[in-house]
């Protein structure tokens, strides 16, 4: 997909943004959109090959990768690795996380059990962009076998480079955090 096509999708997904936002929201948005360098990366056996492809790709782009496993193709349980990725992000050790399993569904469920995590299962560029612009997702979950290597790399690159739009979306993020606090 060309850069022009990606821009068109970003413009369609982003919609209208409110001009008037509080100073606190502006500061939080700057933090949300600062250059991401540290990535937690994990997979179960179904996502192992995709994890290795993504790891090499991101290292070549200069990202610092914390690989939490798995380190082989033997059968393992995705919640174990999803929890490791989510904890690295929630603790601040890593700025974002990527978790890959066979379909991405179970990993998304597991990651979202960790306080402070907004994991998004994405399957195309539109959902990738939406997850960042509207939801400020800090963990991406993917179904590794569902995508070819080029798609995986493009999706990850766009996800890492797409900024949070802020504006009206802050209110929604705050509502998610209120649910998380039990309110």
What are these regions (language model features)?
Residues 3-11, 16-19, 28-35, 42, ...:
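C-terminal binding/interaction regions
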Residues 38, 95-98, 118-120, 137-141:
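Structural motif
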Residues 40-65:
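Glycine-rich phosphate/diphosphate-binding loop of Rossmann-like nucleotide-binding domains
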Residues 62-65, 117-124:
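Short hydrophobic/aromatic-enriched beta-strand-loop microsegments
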Residues 64-75:
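A short beta-strand-loop structural module common to alpha/beta enzyme folds
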Residues 81-99:
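Short, structured active-site "lid" loops
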Residues 100-119:
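Compact, glycine-rich, soluble single-domain proteins
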């Amino acid at each position: 997909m060309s850069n022009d096509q990606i821009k068109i999708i970003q413009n369609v997904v982003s919609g209208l943004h409110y001009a008037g936002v509080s100073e606190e929201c502006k500061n939080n948005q700057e933090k949300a959109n600062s250059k991401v360098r540290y990535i937690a990366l994990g997979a179960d056996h179904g996502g192992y090959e995709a994890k290795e492809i993504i790891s090499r790709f991101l290292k070549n782009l200069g990202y610092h990768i914390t690989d939490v496993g798995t380190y082989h193709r033997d059968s393992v349980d995705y919640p174990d690795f999803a929890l490791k990725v989510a904890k690295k992000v929630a603790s601040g050790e890593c700025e974002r996380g990527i978790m890959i399993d066979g379909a991405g569904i179970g990993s998304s469920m597991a990651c979202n059990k960790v306080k402070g995590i907004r994991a998004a299962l994405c399957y195309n560029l539109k959902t990738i962009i939406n997850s960042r612009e509207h939801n400020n997702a800090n963990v991406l979950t993917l179904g590794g076998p569902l995508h070819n290597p080029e798609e995986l790399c493009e999706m990850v690159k766009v996800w890492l480079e797409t900024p949070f739009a802020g504006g009206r979306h802050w209110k929604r993020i705050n509502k998610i955090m209120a649910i998380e606090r039990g309110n």
